[in-house]
């Protein structure tokens, strides 16, 4: 899921 910004390592990467 790309709900988090690309630069945010705490977010999901799919």
Swiss-Prot record:
Domain-level remarks: The transactivation domain mediates the interaction with CCNT1, GCN5L2, and MDM2. The Arg-rich RNA-binding region binds the TAR RNA. This region also mediates the nuclear localization through direct binding to KPNB1 and is involved in Tat's transfer across cell membranes (protein transduction). The same region is required for the interaction with EP300, PCAF, EIF2AK2 and KDR.
Presence of keyword Lipoprotein: no
Assembly description: Interacts with host CCNT1. Associates with the P-TEFb complex composed at least of Tat, P-TEFb (CDK9 and CCNT1), TAR RNA, RNA Pol II. Recruits the HATs CREBBP, TAF1/TFIID, EP300, PCAF and GCN5L2. Interacts with host KAT5/Tip60; this interaction targets the latter to degradation. Interacts with the host deacetylase SIRT1. Interacts with host capping enzyme RNGTT; this interaction stimulates RNGTT. Binds to host KDR, and to the host integrins ITGAV/ITGB3 and ITGA5/ITGB1. Interacts with host KPNB1/importin beta-1 without previous binding to KPNA1/importin alpha-1. Interacts with EIF2AK2.
Motif (Cell attachment site): 6-8
Entry keyword set: Acetylation, Activator, AIDS, Apoptosis, Host cytoplasm, Host nucleus, Host-virus interaction, Metal-binding, Methylation, Phosphoprotein, RNA-binding, Secreted, Transcription, Transcription regulation, Ubl conjugation, Zinc
The protein, known as: Protein Tat
Organism: Human immunodeficiency virus type 1 group M subtype B (isolate WMJ22) (HIV-1)
Localization, UniProt: Host nucleus, Host nucleolus; Host cytoplasm; Secreted
Domain of life of the source: Viruses
Similarity field: Belongs to the lentiviruses Tat family.
Signal peptide: none
Further remark: Isolates WMJ1, WMJ2, and WMJ3 were obtained from blood samples sequentially taken from a two-year old Haitian who was perinatally infected by her mother.
PTM comment: Acetylation by EP300, CREBBP, GCN5L2/GCN5 and PCAF regulates the transactivation activity of Tat.
Known role: Transcriptional activator that increases RNA Pol II processivity, thereby increasing the level of full-length viral transcripts. Recognizes a hairpin structure at the 5'-LTR of the nascent viral mRNAs referred to as the transactivation responsive RNA element (TAR) and recruits the cyclin T1-CDK9 complex (P-TEFb complex) that will in turn hyperphosphorylate the RNA polymerase II to allow efficient elongation. The CDK9 component of P-TEFb and other Tat-activated kinases hyperphosphorylate the C-terminus of RNA Pol II that becomes stabilized and much more processive.
UniProt GO molecular function: metal ion binding; RNA binding
């Amino acid at each position: 899921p790309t709900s988090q910004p690309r630069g945010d390592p705490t977010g999901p990467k799919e």
